[in-house]
């Protein structure tokens, strides 16, 4: 199937009598309720459930193996190839399926808040609530922008269309396929709305580096003086909590680009976890869930329509989607200058990493590639004790290119803009999980504050004898003994043994990076 035929098929779909294009939020909310796709909550949000798929399906995600990208993609378990033939046949079937639907919903918008680098996109949805979701998550065009909008990538989403693995070359009924040549994302068999968000992120992770822009899985905020901070960290490290600072404005909570102009948000909204959400703990998120917001897999009281954020009957991965303007303390448009400070967050359950360390450029690249944290019991089926987990660049499921490409770009930008990088351990202190205790949140906030305001630039440090990290000896508001992890352990020999064990896990994980420079390994990793 040629690109021309793809465009003809899309044109027919978009011009069909069933296509509802660029409906407003109230119109979409009406459609969701009339079509019985979801319920209205007491705060005016729409609540919908996603059936058996309550999270992403990494084993069902494919990139079409096309001549123009075949030698650029890092093929493997994350970027699984599928043939053009399989894609073309499935694409044709999905389009025929959607043409028969009574209604389709179309959103046109952008990914990328920097107008120089934004990607015009369109999303064709079988579900009205999915269209409401993308309306809130991506960047909405002005009326003037809409008149000249020409989509460069299209998501075609048909959750009720089930693939046949024997015929379609998939691993299950669900599929998420990206064709870079045809500029199409094809999604079916899963109702989980996050697949649309993350598909566009994966695409930006391919397109932006081609323009010398580093794409990043991180949150970002800016201080009153215009100083920018990035927060990288896997689930459970405190990224959302620590980047929500009343004295700093949020640029974005999840996906960013770093160009020669500075940092920009890729999205126009937030997709926040809301398990155990409360106004006391996270008022920004709690207050953002108003009319037009989307709740995913959150249990709602049948009579009062009040959301119960503590109920994990459907999943622990309950989510809320809302536009950036639903939060008070933000920068709009979501662009800012070059980062002054970069924070890597890790929740080390072995209790051996320092609560804060200063990183050299090589150490920053090493820890960026490592993307370490601990997977805790309860976060994944089968995990009963904490396990070391490594997610390359803090976002391996979304990286189509070789990881070293992103790391090299990070190193170049750190050097060029003199960004200060810190590794912050929000995990355990005084012993490993089960013996020690979780790091005091007040101490972590004080350490991050000291990093942001430049106090750690002049403080005395000591080199950690196993990890080679520069550990500050004094941080305002934090007891000195907390800063050196060994001092918090009663059994010093047990500390050393556990630290060497983790250092060896870092080294074993790093063996997969065969294309990185020796400097990163020799100057960036553990020294014992």
Curated annotation (Swiss-Prot):
GO terms for molecular function: ATP binding; metal ion binding; phosphoenolpyruvate carboxykinase (ATP) activity. Substrate binds at residues 56, 192, 198, 319. One of its GO terms (biological process) is gluconeogenesis. It is an enzyme of class 4 (lyase). Its cofactor is Mn(2+). Keywords: ATP-binding, Cytoplasm, Decarboxylase, Gluconeogenesis, Lyase, Manganese, Metal-binding, Nucleotide-binding. Involved in the gluconeogenesis. Catalyzes the conversion of oxaloacetate (OAA) to phosphoenolpyruvate (PEP) through direct phosphoryl transfer between the nucleoside triphosphate and OAA. This is Phosphoenolpyruvate carboxykinase (ATP). The gene is pckA.
């Amino acid at each position: 199937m040629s690109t021309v035929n793809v465009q003809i098929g899309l044109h027919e779909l978009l011009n069909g009598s069933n296509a509802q294009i660029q409906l407003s939020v109230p119109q979409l909310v009406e459609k969701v309720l009339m079509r019985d796709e979801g319920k209205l909550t007491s705060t005016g949000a729409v609540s919908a459930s996603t059936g058996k798929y309550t999270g992403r399906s990494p084993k069902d995600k494919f990139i079409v193996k096309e001549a123009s990208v075949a030698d650029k993609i890092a093929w493997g378990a994350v970027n699984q190839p599928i043939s053009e033939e399989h894609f073309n046949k499935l694409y044709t079937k999905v389009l025929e399926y959607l043409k028969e639907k009574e209604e389709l919903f179309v959103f046109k918008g952008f990914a990328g808040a920097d107008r120089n680098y934004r990607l015009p996109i369109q999303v064709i949805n079988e579900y009205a609530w999915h269209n409401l979701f993308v309306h809130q998550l991506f960047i909405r065009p002005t009326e003037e922008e809409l008149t000249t909008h020409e989509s460069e990538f299209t998501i075609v989403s048909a959750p009720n269309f089930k693939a046949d693995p024997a015929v379609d070359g998939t691993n299950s009924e669900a599929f998420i396929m990206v064709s870079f040549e045809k500029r199409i994302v094809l999604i079916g068999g899963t109702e989980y709305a996050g697949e649309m968000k993350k598909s566009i992120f994966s695409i930006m992770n391919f397109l932006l580096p081609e323009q010398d822009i580093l794409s990043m899985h991180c949150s970002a905020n800016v201080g009153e003086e215009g100083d920018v901070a990035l927060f990288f960290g896997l689930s459970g490290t405190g990224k959302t909590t620590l980047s929500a600072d009343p004295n700093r404005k949020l640029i974005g909570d999840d996906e960013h680009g770093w160009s020669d102009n500075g940092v920009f948000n890729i999205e126009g909204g937030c997709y926040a976890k809301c398990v155990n959400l409360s106004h006391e703990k996270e008022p920004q998120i709690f207050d953002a869930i108003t009319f037009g917001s989307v709740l995913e897999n959150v249990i709602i009281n049948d009579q009062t329509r009040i959301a119960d954020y503590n109920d994990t009957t459907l999943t622990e991965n309950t989510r809320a989607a809302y536009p950036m303007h639903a939060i008070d303390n933000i920068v709009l448009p979501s662009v800012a200058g070059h980062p002054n400070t970069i924070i890597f967050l890790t929740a080390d359950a072995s209790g051996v990493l320092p609560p804060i360390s200063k990183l050299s450029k090589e150490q920053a690249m090493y820890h960026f590639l490592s993307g370490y944290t601990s997977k805790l019991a309860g976060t994944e089926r089968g995990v009963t004790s904490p396990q070391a987990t490594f997610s390359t660049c803090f976002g391996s499921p979304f990286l189509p290119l070789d990881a070293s490409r992103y790391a090299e770009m990070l190193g170049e930008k750190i050097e060029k803009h003199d960004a200060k990088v810190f590794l912050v351990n929000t995990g355990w202190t005084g012993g490993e999980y089960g013996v020690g205790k979780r790091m005091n949140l007040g101490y972590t906030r004080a350490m991050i504050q000291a990093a942001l305001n430049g106090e750690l630039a002049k403080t005395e440090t000591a080199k950690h004898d196993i990890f080679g990290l520069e550990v500050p000896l004094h941080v305002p508001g934090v007891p000195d003994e907390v800063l050196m992890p060994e001092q918090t352990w009663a059994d010093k020999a047990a500390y050393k043994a556990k630290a060497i064990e983790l250092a060896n896990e870092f080294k074993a994980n790093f063996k997969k990076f065969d294309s990185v420079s020796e400097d990163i390994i020799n100057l960036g990793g553990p020294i014992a």
